[in-house]
């Protein structure tokens, strides 16, 4: 029994040693998150970029926090001396027990617009997963004053109400125009019908007049022809011996 137990313990220790050598046991893994976008105007005296991290299987020692900035010029390493004073351009605050750090940009100007990256590392751990950076926060400093959220919400609601009002006015105008155009259209149709009837009546009267005139002329010509024929007949009878 003792020999079997000792053998199992030795096998377990060998397995742990192998796993530790390949990094399966005690592997330190970090993940870092930070806001991807921040926008302020020149009236802000300072802006703070927050960074949170989570560590799994890492040593109990406190990690190191680093900040980088990528702007229009060369990338910069920020706050290598700590940046603990608010009189500095940048101020770093660390709450490592709560897994939180932050970078404050003081006396904000448009030149501070850049991408700020938070980095967390356990220097004693050689693995790459023990040194991670966030996705970066794009800071945009506007040279014009931005509207507050309350004012933007109010303006959005006002624009929506105006859109509804304008739509209602347009619909009412269209309906009113249609209602006014219908009587005029009916009147025009009626007048056109009366004009057509009047024209038809005039044409009929003209046709009747022409027919009557032609009929009278035909009768007169017929009577004239008959008289001529009778005169010729009488003359013929008179000339016979």
From Swiss-Prot:
The chain crosses the membrane at residues 154-174. Disulfide bonds join 51-118. One of its GO terms (molecular function) is transmembrane signaling receptor activity. GO terms for biological process: cell surface receptor signaling pathway; immune response. Keywords: Disulfide bond, Immunoglobulin domain, Membrane, Signal, Transmembrane, Transmembrane helix. InterPro entries: Ig-like_dom, Ig-like_dom_sf, Ig-like_fold, Ig_V-set, IGSF6. Expressed in peripheral blood lymphocytes, spleen and lymph node, with low levels in thymus, bone marrow and fetal liver. No expression in non-immune tissues. GO terms for cellular component: plasma membrane. Residues 175-241 are cytoplasmic. Its main location: membrane. It is a single-pass type I membrane protein. Residues 28-153 are extracellular. Induction: By TNF and CSF2/GM-CSF in dendritic cells and down regulation by phorbol myristate acetate (PMA) and ionomycin in monocytes. Gene3D superfamilies: Immunoglobulins. SUPFAM superfamilies: Immunoglobulin. It is found in: Membrane. Residues 214-241 are annotated as: Disordered. It holds the Pfam family V-set. Residues 30-134 form the Ig-like C2-type domain. It comes from the Eukaryota. Residues 1-27 form the signal peptide. Residues 222-241 have a biased composition (Basic and acidic residues). This gene is localized to a locus associated with inflammatory bowel disease. It is coded entirely within the intron of METTL9 which is transcribed in the opposite strand of the DNA. This is Immunoglobulin superfamily member 6. The gene is IGSF6.
């Amino acid at each position: 029994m003792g020999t079997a137990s000792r053998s199992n313990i030795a096998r377990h220790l060998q397995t742990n040693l192998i796993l530790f050598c390949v990094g399966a046991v005690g592997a330190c893994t970090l993940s870092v998150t930070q806001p991807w976008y921040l926008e302020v105007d020149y009236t802000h005296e300072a802006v703070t970029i927050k960074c949170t991290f989570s560590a799994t299987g890492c040593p109990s020692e406190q990690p190191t926090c680093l900040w980088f900035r990528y702007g229009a010029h060369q990338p910069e390493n920020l706050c290598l001396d700590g940046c603990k004073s608010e009189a500095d351009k940048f101020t770093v605050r660390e709450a490592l027990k709560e897994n939180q750090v932050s970078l404050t940009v003081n006396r904000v100007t448009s030149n501070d617009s850049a991408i700020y990256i938070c980095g967390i590392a356990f220097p004693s751990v050689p693995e790459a997963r023990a040194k991670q950076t966030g996705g970066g926060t794009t800071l945009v400093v506007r040279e014009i004053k931005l509207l507050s959220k309350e004012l933007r919400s109010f303006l959005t609601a006002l624009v929506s109400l105006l859109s509804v009002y304008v739509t209602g006015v347009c619909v009412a105008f269209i309906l009113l125009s249609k209602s006014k155009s219908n009587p005029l259209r009916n009147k025009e149709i009626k007048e056109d019908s009366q004009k057509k009837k009047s024209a038809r009546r005039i044409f009929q009267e003209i046709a009747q007049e022409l027919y009557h005139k032609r009929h009278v002329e035909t009768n007169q010509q017929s009577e004239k022809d008959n008289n001529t024929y009778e005169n010729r007949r009488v003359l013929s009878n008179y000339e016979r011996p």
